[in-house]
């Protein structure tokens, strides 16, 4: 199937007189998690990961570029048809840089402009100046044209959230955004990203699995707020009278008219708009800056934080019940598979008040599968073995909050290697959880601090240490992150971010320990900063015990022991009232027993 599609695309490239096609893992809204009908990278390659780039050469091999999360997965899924470029390995280049090194002749690279940002477009093009390579804009999408039996587009009517969940009305949010537009001299603002539109409208949807968003565009003017969606007549106008709702397909015609009639600047975020939208407007009429919704959404208000805290308690209670049942089953020597565990966890999650959906498909990787960072569908054939560990990464969408938690558990008596490595990863987690930092600190600095103990042992992990998370929105949210990749956004109070160091060894397994945290201002107990800056820290939101069988107590410092015992004490106090059955309460009490005792 994939081979035939690749050949069909190559034939179309020949007809278009193009040398290559670039297929990115995005769509017209730059989604990370895609609806089925927009998974073009998967349709052309078979790769099911959430991030990657395909380059199909009209003559020669097909190429797939993936980061370290997907090295193993990409080889397993696509290695027979694609040359897999494992980013992060020595001598391996990103897709656009690899293209830049093909210097026998200038190349025409075809791309769908509605899947690439202006920032990407310009960065790639500037890197090709010496070779003369250039973009070729496609009318339509080349993959769509060869994708037989493409899934139907799912679009549902959005639903409104009250201020008891959002903490602020859409009218108030629009007022603040318009003030920032005035300050920056913008007549209009165009929004493409679905979580930004959902946040600004105080609407949610179910057009993408596990992401409570609806497919839409938005245009904000000083006297109008227009939303282009699939159900403009569904009754949301009565709930949001400050907005005008039009059919989704009217968007392109509207911005074309806006481009002709506007006399002022139109604000387009170069990292959150597609080149398809950007090319509608003359350069002289475009204000290219990060749009004002990005930071407003990232820094949660008190209501959003309270709702997130409640969501985490519900998720923690469900996860504790599941872990208790897992331990009971393993001790009884009853058969259990990865799929059994994932199904049990979803059952427990869905029983919690306010549950809406999982926040992403559960990762339950046993043994060597734990080394696949974004392991796919848990297998009903992979049985849980007593000598192995189980890595579980899961979360929920709960009314008002989004969770994401990873725990790695021993399924029997752990080996010395498992305990050594688990304890090292736990120490990295504690290091970040305890870290104090001045305002203005970027995530790259905290990333290095978190990894330092692992580095001293010759250990590391290929993914970032932390990603932002939304408030009943996407489980991956920008711009905040804790990563080696430098980013120009400092961590600010109210941001929610993950703390998830790890270790992975192909053929052996993986360890990851993840809690979500909120960035907060530290009010007392610290010296005055010489620059007058506030001191910030992270407050943990998730409370699920760490596996004490895997912890080498004597390897922990007194400060680390105190942090861990305090964390487990808080875990017990917060969850004991949510666990009605004695067997779960007894399991929790045992799991939270202080190591210093």
Positions of predicted regions on the chain:
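Active-site neighborhoods and metal-handling regions in enzymes and metal-associated proteins
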Residues: 1-597
């Amino acid at each position: 199937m994939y081979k035939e599609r690749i050949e069909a695309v190559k034939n179309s490239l020949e007809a278009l007189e193009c040398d290559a096609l670039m297929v990115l893992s995005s769509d017209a809204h730059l989604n990370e998690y895609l609806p089925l009908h927009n998974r073009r990278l998967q349709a052309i390659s078979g790769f099911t990961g959430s991030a990657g780039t395909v380059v199909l050469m009209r003559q020669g091999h097909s190429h797939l570029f993936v980061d370290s999360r997907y090295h193993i997965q990409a080889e397993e899924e696509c290695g027979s048809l694609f040359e897999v470029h494992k980013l992060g390995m020595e001598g391996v280049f990103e897709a656009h840089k690899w293209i830049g090194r093909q210097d026998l002749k200038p190349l025409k690279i075809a791309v769908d402009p509605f899947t690439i940002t202006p920032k990407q477009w310009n960065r790639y093009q500037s890197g090709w100046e010496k070779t003369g390579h250039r973009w070729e804009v496609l009318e339509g999408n080349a993959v769509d044209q060869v994708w037989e039996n493409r899934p139907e587009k799912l679009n549902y009517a959005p639903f409104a959230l009250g201020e008891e969940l959002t903490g602020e009305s859409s009218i108030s949010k629009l007022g603040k955004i318009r003030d920032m537009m005035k300050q920056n001299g913008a007549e209009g603002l165009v929004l493409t990203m679905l979580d930004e539109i959902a946040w600004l409208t105080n609407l949610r949807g179910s057009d993408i699995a596990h992401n409570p968003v609806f497919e839409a565009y938005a245009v904000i003017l000083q006297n109008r707020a227009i939303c282009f969606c699939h159900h403009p007549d569904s009754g949301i106008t009565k709930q949001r009278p400050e907005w005008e709702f039009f059919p989704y397909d009217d968007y392109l015609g509207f911005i074309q008219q806006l481009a002709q009639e506007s006399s002022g600047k139109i604000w387009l975020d170069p990292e959150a708009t597609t080149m398809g939208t950007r090319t509608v407007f003359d350069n002289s009429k475009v204000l290219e800056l990060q749009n004002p919704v990005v930071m407003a959404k990232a820094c949660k208000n008190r209501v959003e934080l309270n709702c997130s805290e409640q969501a985490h308690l519900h998720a923690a209670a469900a996860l504790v019940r599941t872990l208790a049942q897992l331990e009971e089953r393993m001790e009884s020597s009853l058969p259990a598979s990865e799929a059994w565990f994932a199904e049990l966890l979803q059952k427990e999650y869905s029983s919690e008040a306010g549950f809406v959906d999982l926040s992403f498909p559960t990762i339950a990787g046993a043994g060597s599968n734990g080394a696949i960072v974004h392991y796919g569908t848990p297998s009903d054939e992979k049985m849980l073995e007593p000598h192995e560990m189980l890595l579980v990464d899961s979360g929920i969408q709960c009314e008002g909050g989004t969770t994401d938690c990873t725990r790695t558990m021993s399924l029997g008596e752990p080996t010395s290697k498992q305990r050594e490595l688990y304890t090292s990863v736990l120490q990295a987690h504690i290091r970040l959880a305890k870290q104090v930092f001045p305002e203005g600190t970027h995530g790259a600095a905290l990333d290095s601090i978190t990894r330092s103990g692992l580095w001293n042992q010759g250990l590391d992990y290929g993914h970032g240490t932390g990603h932002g998370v939304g408030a009943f929105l996407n489980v991956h949210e920008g711009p905040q992150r804790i990563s080696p990749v430098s980013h120009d956004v400092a961590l600010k109070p109210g941001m929610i971010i993950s703390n998830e160091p790890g270790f992975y060894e192909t053929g052996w397994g993986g360890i990851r320990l993840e809690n979500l945290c909120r960035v907060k201002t530290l009010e007392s107990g610290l010296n005055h900063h010489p620059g007058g800056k506030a001191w910030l820290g992270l407050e943990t939101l998730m409370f699920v015990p760490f596996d004490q069988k895997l912890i080498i107590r004597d390897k922990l410092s007194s400060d680390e022991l105190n942090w861990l015992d305090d964390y487990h004490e808080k875990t017990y106090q917060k969850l004991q009232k949510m666990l009605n059955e004695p067997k779960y309460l007894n399991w929790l009490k045992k799991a939270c027993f202080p190591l210093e005792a």
